[in-house]
Each structure stands twice: as structure tokens, then as C-alpha cells.
Amino acid sequence: MAEDTDGGIRFNSLCFINDHVGFQGSIKTSPSDFIVIEIDEQGQLVSKATDGSLYEISKIQSEPSNSVKKPKLNIQNVSLEHKNSEGAADLPGCSDGDRSHQSDSEKENSVNSVTSKCEEESVDLLRSLLDEKTHTSLGQFACDIKRMWNSQTELTEPSPELSLGKILDKNRRAVLHSAVRQAFPFLITVGNQGEVVVKPNRECKELCRLVSEEEALGFFKYLDAKKENSKFTFKPDPNKDHRKAVHHFLNKKFGNLVETKSFPGQHHSAGNPDSAITVRFREKARGKRSHPEGCERGKAVYTAFTLQKENLETFEAIGLLAVKLGVIPSDFSYAGLKDKRAITYQSMVVKKVTPERLKSIKEEIEKKRMNVFNIRSVGDCLRLGQLKGNHFEIIIRHLRNQLNDSANLTERILEAIENVKNKGFVNYYGPQRFGKGQKIQTDQIGLALLKNEMVKAIKLFLTPEDVDDPVNKAKQYFLRTEDAKGTLSLMPEFRVRERALLESLHRFGVTEEGCVRAWFSFPHSMRIFYIHAYSSRIWNEAASYRLAAYGPKVVEGDLICSDEDADKHFPSSKVHLVTKEEESAHTYALHQVVLPVLGYNVQYPENQVGRWYQEALSRDGLQACRFRVPALKLNVPGCYRHIVKHPRNVSHRLVHPDPATEEARVEGPHSDDTASSLSLSFDLDASCYATVCLREMMKGDI
């Protein structure tokens, strides 16, 4: 298949399987000309109002459980010999929820009262768990480690260690591990066949080089406590470079557990630019440690709703909703992406938001061309592909014949509709999958990610278009300077994705590691979207090659799936390799042929098409690619996609202008050639594109 010089697909190089002439017209003249309504797994349109009685929200529904048994720990000023408590009130601490509205005295009192209580609990626990000799040895070991650190003596290898003996009872062992780390946060404990061993916490020493000892000890107490919904805040710091170093350390060492963010200090001003770093547990990290296996979903709050949006990308809509609801984009789940230049209806589920909270923002989001309805509580999130398909209502305007075609226009239109109904269309991924009209297309970003070229992928994402507007000026500035902070000041507030990425780059730097961190500012569904875009481009090219090489005939080595109702994620066990005998007997038809969408768990055709796949991967430098990007936690198993699909429930109306009134009137199939628009309605399976179906019908680019 031919490609543009910038690597994007020339959509007009794709094939047709029908021999009609087609016609010309304009689609998406306005969003109301292109309506997309998701069809759920039960075959119902999601735009249809649900029976409210079926989704009555329980008034006694509980919030997510916070029943973690460990006490809240705000200990900040525990010296290793447990002597000096002076100045503890001046140290920042961790707390449940948001305490930003407390006065300084309230904060100090709450911190100190809990500190005293927790110190007593830890000391009492250790004395009750250890015999006197072991307890004394532990105290001496802790003092020795502290003296070595204070004298700047480097620890020898292997690290010094102390055995606290074998503890046969599992629960008793767990309590001992926690009690030691709470009393001595500069120590760590490890288990070895029931034996509890104590070692120096080298990461605590590293953190002490960046922050005060009190802050470092407090942070490790916070980390061990794993108190749900808690936060830990370091002292305000006016030095931006120093704060960045602390961010880097915490995210490098504990990024899988916690996330960090700087907030202006209480006395922040232009002359006093101090900000404080606040740490909180990541949602997944809290979930793994706070709930028994498989119990989190039952206790979390999930709210399902239908999202109506107009002239907005799905990701853009999610970003706006996340801001209004105070959650992050990855808290939203959906069955599929929908067109931007359209009015679309789709199911969504948001986590950690009650139905009442979602209802409260309805008026605000209407200003952003969005609406939410069918709001109800559910028990789990949505998965990609969890839909039956989509229903389309489309108006094609300015109808006319193809160039040099003088035939009756109405007959051309009716012929085209009947052909596609009966013979189908090539099931290409649509141009919107790749960023139609954009200089850099999504598949190019996906290729860079598959090759682990993280900095390149970021720069591709931030490549400007040839348009003189604030967004593209900001992107130009970034590519010229790599100044993430300066670019943030230029990037408009409504560009949620770009700003999230730039905030991460400002925090972590424009390095390979920093760019990996920046990609995590996007939810998993968006990160993997770019990989899927590359796989989609290869599939489109493979489909064109297959049709050019063999035409409509099913040949030996083709892959077929006889179940036309199977979704695109059916396993390889459902795929059959066509034999020579089956080719000769014409056992199968073209609509049963599937091609693999790239991944680590797919089978390739055993004919010229299979060889083409390998050559395409080698061309792009992916001959050894395993379709896993561990740095971004992306795994792409692959799937299969039918070459040909058919629209269902097709209906149409021709609309003509009335010569007397200039108003449009609807006519039957025998109208004359003054038709000005065509109203089409049809259903497509999940992951099929209406623009591709129209392309086959009209025989031209859309």
C-alpha cells in the first residue's frame, strides 16, 4: 500500500470489493448529520431511557471500606534512642483525607496526640513480642546503625543484620514486622522461612540526604502504615530543583506504590515561592493492600451512565468529566471510542463517584456540549469491546454524480446501497483511527512506543500542526526548547491531555525515564490506543495486499472463522487454516476470512500474506518485537478481524428541495435527479467504521 511521505496512510489507496460506480456527497457537514448510538450487549440502544425502577439507588449503600486495622501514624520526631521530642509540633505529618482547613494549632495537636499514642503502641508491641534479650539486642543494633550513619561511615557489604528468631505464627510475625518498622523506620525487616531478620534501610538513608531525618522517618512510617485515603506532606521548600530531586527519588523508588504532587505552601507568594510535596498511595497500591483478593470490586463505588457528547473526542470528554468530578481519567471505563465530529451516545462507568455526585454536574457539563443520563449504581467497570455494535443515523448532503458520469443519480445511489447490503465492504480501520488530516498520526506514536523510543514518542505527540493557534504555538515552543514548564504556561487549559503530559515532564524531566513517567499521566486505555493504531495500520495494509494477491477467492493458507457472530477477540482455537482440498472444493467464502491484528498470541496466514506480515515488521524494525512494553505496562496479545463485513437494518430516504417552497421533501425511490441529500440508517458490529462503509458505497474518500 502506498504511504504519504510523513508515514501516514493514504486512505485512497485502499481497495473496494464492489463494482458499482458510486456517487459523491458531503458527510459530517455538522455534528447532527452524523449520529452514533452504541448498542449494548443485550442489543439495546444506550440512548433509550432505562426503567428507573430497575436501578433504584439504595439509600443505605456504603462507601468503600476504610477498615484497615493499622493505627493512623503521624510520628515524625522519633529519634533512634527515643529521647528528644522537642520540635515535633513543627513537623509536617500524614492525615486521613483533606485537612487543609485546619488551623496550625489543630494540626499540631492532632499530630502530637497520635504520635504519643503510636510511640507507646510500638514500644509495647515489641516488648510483648520479643524476649528481653532479643529486645535489648534490637535496640543496640538500631543504635549501632544510627551511629554509623551519623559518623558518615558507609555500610559494609553484605549489610549488617540481626535475627529476631523464628516466629511460627504467621499473624504474630506480621505484627512484629510492622512494629519494628514503626519503632525504627530506618530499619527494614525480611522474612526467611519463619525467621524475622532486621537490616538497615538504605533507602531511608538516601532520603535523609534530601530531606530532614524527621521527615524521612515520618515518610517511612507512613509508607509502612498503608493507611487508606491518607496523605503525607513534607515541609514547604522554596527550592524548585530540590523539590524536583525529591519527586524523582520518591517516584523512582516507590512510584508503583505512591504518587507525589507539589502544592503551594501556606505562606506562598511571588517573594516566597515555597511549595510542599504531598504523597498519597496510588489507588491500585491501596487496593492490593487494603482488601482481600477479589473483594475490592464489591466495596468500590461504580456509577454507570450514558454519555452524550457533541464534537468532542472520547478522551477529551473524559478529561473534562474527570476535572469536574475530582477523579482521574483512568477512573472511567467504556466499551469503545466514538467519533469526534458527531453526536454520540455511549455507555460509561466511573469509579469512586456516586450517582448523586454525577447528577450534580449535569448543568455544568451541558456548557461543554455533553450530557449524562441513565445514571445508576453498578458492581463493576466496563471493558473495551463490551458492546454489540453501533447504530448510525447519517445525512449525506450535496449529492452528485461521479466525474464524467451522466447516469441517473438516484439509480446510482440505490445501486450502491443494495450492493453494500448484499456484498459488504472491506472492514478497514477508519481514517479517524490514525488522526485524519494530522501531520503526525497515532500509528507513528505507537511504532515509537513499541520500539521503546519514549522521548521520540513524546515529541511526536507534541508535534504541532501547520495552524497558527495557541495550542500549536505551545507545541512549537516545546520542540524548540524542551521547556515543559514554559510550555505549560502557553498551553490552553482545555487541552487536558497535553497539560497532563507536560506537568509530568516538568516534574520528571525530558529523559527516557522521565518520558516513561509522563506516559503514565494517561490512562492505560489511552497508552495502548497508540499501539493498537500501529497494529491497525498494518492490518489495513495486509487486507489490501490479501485482496490484491488473491481477490475474493479463499486460498490455501488463509485463516477463516466460520462464526460470523464471533467478536474480534475470539481465540486462535476458533481459527482454521484452509487446506488445499478446501480451496479446491470452494468450502469457504471471503466473508469468513480473517487476518491477524498484531500481537504476541496470534497465528499468521501460511501463504504470501503471512510472508508479507514478516516483511512489514522487518521494514519497521520490529522483526524481534514481542508486543510487550514493560516500561508502560502494556501487553498486546493481538486478535483477528474479518476482512469483509455487512451493514444490518439498512434503511434510506432521499430528500429533495421543493421548487415552490425551497423546503426539503422526502420522496420514494423513483425521485428525479434533483436529490440534494440522502438520509441513511444502519447498524454495524463493534469496531466497524461507518465512514469505511460509506466509502465503499460512494466509491471515494470521505
Swiss-Prot record:
EC numbers: 5.4.99.-
Residues with the Phosphoserine modification: 79
Skewed-composition ranges (Basic and acidic residues): 96-109
Catalytic residues in the record: 339 (nucleophile)
Organism superkingdom: Eukaryota
Keywords from the named record: Isomerase, mRNA processing, Phosphoprotein
Residue numbers spanned by region Disordered: 84-116
Residue ranges of domain TRUD in the record: 424-646
InterPro entries per UniProt: PsdUridine_synth_cat_dom_sf (IPR020103), PsdUridine_synth_TruD (IPR001656), PsdUridine_synth_TruD_insert (IPR011760), PUS7L_N (IPR056963), R3H_PUS7L (IPR056961), TruD_catalytic (IPR042214)
Reactions the enzyme catalyzes: a uridine in mRNA = a pseudouridine in mRNA
Family matches, as SUPFAM superfamilies: Pseudouridine synthase
Example GO molecular function: RNA binding
Pfam families xrefs: PUS7L_N, R3H_PUS7L, TruD
CDD domains: PseudoU_synth_ScPUS7
PROSITE patterns assigned to the protein according to its UniProt record, in alphabetical order: TRUD (PS50984)
GO biological process, alphabetically ordered: mRNA processing; mRNA pseudouridine synthesis
Role according to the record: Pseudouridine synthase that catalyzes pseudouridylation of mRNAs.
Family of this protein: Belongs to the pseudouridine synthase TruD family.
NCBIfam families (UniProt xref): tRNA_TruD_broad (TIGR00094)
Protein name per its UniProtKB record: Pseudouridylate synthase PUS7L
Organism: Mus musculus
